[in-house]
Structure formats: structure tokens, C-alpha cells
Amino acid sequence: MSAFGNPFTSGAKPNLSNTSGINPFTNNAASTNNMGGSAFGRPSFGTANTMTGGTTTSAFGMPQFGTNTGNTGNTSISAFGNTSNAAKPSAFGAPAFGSSAPINVNPPSTTSAFGAPSFGSTGFGAMAATSNPFGKSPGSMGSAFGQPAFGANKTAIPSSSVSNSNNSAFGAASNTPLTTTSPFGSLQQNASQNASSTSSAFGKPTFGAATNTQSPFGTIQNTSTSSGTGVSPFGTFGTNSNNKSPFSNLQSGAGAGSSPFGTTTSKANNNNNVGSSAFGTTNNQSPFSGGSGGTFGSASNLNKNTNGNFQSSFGNKGFSFGITPQNDANKVSQSNPSFGQTMPNTDPNISLKSNGNATSFGFGQQQMNATNVNANTATGKIRFVQGLSSEKDGILELADLAEETLKIFRANKFELGLVPDIPPPPALVA
């Protein structure tokens, strides 16, 4: 037997069943208020606390995480806050996120971790049962913009006896009497009011109203009053010509007024027309000829014997353009022929013969050759015919003219700049 004894041999053994002994690795807290500590100064981690009203703390200063705290009146503190309905503060100073609020507490009085009610409550104002979150109720009072909401019924029961005291930005309502002023004028569907008594923003009744008031464009002429009584800036209509118009009176009525364009001369039974016109009158008097001369293109029917003593404004022989005086054949005409006309032969002592050649100027006047001239030619009673030599002209012979001049006279036509200044000899004309 060794000095230390044999542990495997019979002998004295440690009494492990002694409950009063102290085990450094275990702690049998079977008694009430067992304050026995472990080798580390605290109960071992994970020790079950089954005592009523236990105040045992863990090694970290707080009850261990997940500790069963089902005992009544548990005052233990969790590191992450209470896990019961006890009103104790958590480690972060606010109830845990997602904690259920008490049933008897009103939702608006509950505050969240951010100082406001939790999300899901009426956070933008009072509840809808009390007021509108965006202002007042449209049916009872005005909107948030100072007027009732657009399209809202401002009057519960439309009636003609109820005055609309609400001013709208677009004028008064159409279903109430027009007691308010509209910037666009009064509405015209109210039959009880006089349409012409209301005023528009433009100074006159609106379009389509009664026309018994003055118009800025003149009086309307289709009223039931006497026609043409109102003065229009454009003149009156043709129903009454007694009023003055800036464009003269219409000629459908009596021509009592003067016109700036002259009066019409188509009046019946008026042989002596003394009315003057700025453009002339139609009384067969021409301002371009004197006496009984006609106007342009008109022929004078002279049935009496005349001596041709009327004067013309364009000459002393008395003719008008395009007029052929038909005088007596017994008298010799002293007038010149008109353009394009052939004067008849009124002198029986003169025998004329046509040459058959074309005229020099193309006016249709034929060249005449005198064959039998009696003593009347000496007195100057023969008329002048273009192309024939007169008694004042000297008789030229062919020998007196140069060869170049004879070629010019024998040619069918003259060339420009090569016309002789002397008449042709009678031998070339015959």
C-alpha cells in the first residue's frame, strides 16, 4: 500500500451524496433564498430560477436572455426591454417596435417612437368623422381656397325666392335671381327682368338682347318705329330718302336732294332739263361743239336749211368727231370732212373721177382729179382735196425735177425720211 493510498482499492471514498457538501462545479439551490455562490462568484450561466419572487441576476448584471419569467410579480429586467405588458421602460427609452397598444387607449393619444402616432392611424389631421383632412366639408362651408369647391352645390334646393349671395368668379349662378354683378354682364335667361335694363361690361346689352337702347354702331333700322328716323353713320336705308347721307340720297325716291355725282335725267315729261351734273347732262348738248352740234358718235338730224354757221370748239368749220352734217344739196357745205368720211358732191359744175389708187393716209378718202373746171374755180368756191394741186401751187414739169425725186414719186410708197417737200407734178398724178 502506497503512501498515498490506492484509489481503486477499498477504503474511505468521498461522500458524493452529501447534500450539504459544496460542489465547485454545480450549485443545487434546493433551499429557499439560497445565496450560495459558485466558484466564479455568481450562479452558473443557464441556471433555472424557479423560486417565487426571485431576484437572482445573471453573470452579466441582467436576467439571462430568454429567461422564463412566467412567475407573478416578476421584477427582473431584460437587456432588450420587458417581455410582458408591464409599463416599464426599455433599455432604449421607448416601447419596443411593434408592441401592441393597450386596448382601452384611443389611437390619437398613442405616440410612436418618433413622437407621433404609429403608422396607420390618422396622421394627417383629425379623423374623417369630425372634419375633412383637406379642409372643410364642401356641403357646409367653403373650400381650402376661399370659395366652395368647383362643382359643389352651393344651394341645397334651387329656388327663385332664394337669393344667391355667393359670389362666383364666373358670375352669378343661373338658377337664382341676378342679384350679383358678373364681369361678363348679366345672364339673359331670367325672363322676369328687363333685358335692356341690365348693363354689360362693354357698355351695351349683350348680344341678342332687346334693341331699344342706343347702339355704338348706329340705330338698327328694323324697329317698329318709323323707318329712317335714326341716324346711321352709314346712311339710312332706301325706305326714306328725307335724311341726309354722306353718300347722297338714293334715287329710288323723289330727287329732292342734290348728289355729288350729278342728278339722273331719266325723268318723264321734262323737256327742259336744267339740272347740272359734274359729268354732263343728256340733253343733246355737247360741251365740245357749239350750236346744235352732237356729242361723240351722234348724228345731227338737221331738216332745215342751214348755212353751216355753227362753231366748233376745235375749229372754225363746225364739225364733231364722227358726224356727217346732212345739209341741203342746194347749198355748198363750208365744213371740213370728218375722219373716215367721204364728202358728197354738191356742186354740179364739178366732175370728179376716181383714181382707184390707195390713199396716202389710209383713212378711206379717195383722191380726186378735176377734169372739167369752169370759171367757178377762179372765185375759190372749189373745196380742197388732198393730193391735188391748187391754183397757188406752181405747175412743175418732169424735166424740172431730179431723177431721184421722180423715183420717189413713182414708188408705191414713201420711205421714212425720203418724202419730198414739193407736190408731185400733174403728169404723175393724172
Curated annotation (Swiss-Prot):
Record key words, sorted: Membrane, mRNA transport, Nuclear pore complex, Nucleus, Phosphoprotein, Protein transport, Repeat, Translocation, Transport
Compositional bias annotation for Low complexity: 45-68, 186-201
Positions of the UniProt region annotated as Interaction with GLE1: 365-430
Biased composition (Polar residues): 15-36, 209-230, 237-252, 260-285, 323-346
FG repeat segments: 124-125, 134-135, 296-297, 319-322, 339-340, 361-364
Ranges for the SXFG repeats: 2-5, 78-81, 168-171, 182-185, 215-218, 232-235, 259-262, 277-280, 312-315
Stretch list, region Disordered: 1-68, 180-294, 319-346
Repeat positions for SAFGXPXFG: 38-46, 58-66, 90-98, 112-120, 143-151, 200-208
Subcellular location: Nucleus, Nuclear pore complex; Nucleus membrane
Transmembrane segments: none
InterPro entries: Nucleoporin_NUP42
Record has Transmembrane as a keyword: no
One of the record's GO molecular function terms: structural constituent of nuclear pore
Any one biological process term the GO annotation gives: poly(A)+ mRNA export from nucleus
Membrane topology: Peripheral membrane protein
Family annotation (PANTHER family): NUCLEOPORIN NUP42, NUCLEOPORIN-LIKE PROTEIN 2
Functional description taken from the UniProt entry: Functions as a component of the nuclear pore complex (NPC). NPC components, collectively referred to as nucleoporins (NUPs), can play the role of both NPC structural components and of docking or interaction partners for transiently associated nuclear transport factors. Active directional transport is assured by both, a Phe-Gly (FG) repeat affinity gradient for these transport factors across the NPC and a transport cofactor concentration gradient across the nuclear envelope (GSP1 and GSP2 GTPases associated predominantly with GTP in the nucleus, with GDP in the cytoplasm).
UniProt comment concerning the protein's domains: Contains FG repeats. FG repeats are interaction sites for karyopherins (importins, exportins) and form probably an affinity gradient, guiding the transport proteins unidirectionally with their cargo through the NPC. FG repeat regions are highly flexible and lack ordered secondary structure. The overall conservation of FG repeats regarding exact sequence, spacing, and repeat unit length is limited. FG repeat types and their physico-chemical environment change across the NPC from the nucleoplasmic to the cytoplasmic side: SXFG/PXFG repeats are especially abundant in NUPs on the cytoplasmic side.
Protein name: Nucleoporin NUP42
Biological source species: Saccharomyces cerevisiae (strain ATCC 204508 / S288c)
Gene that this polypeptide is encoded by: NUP42
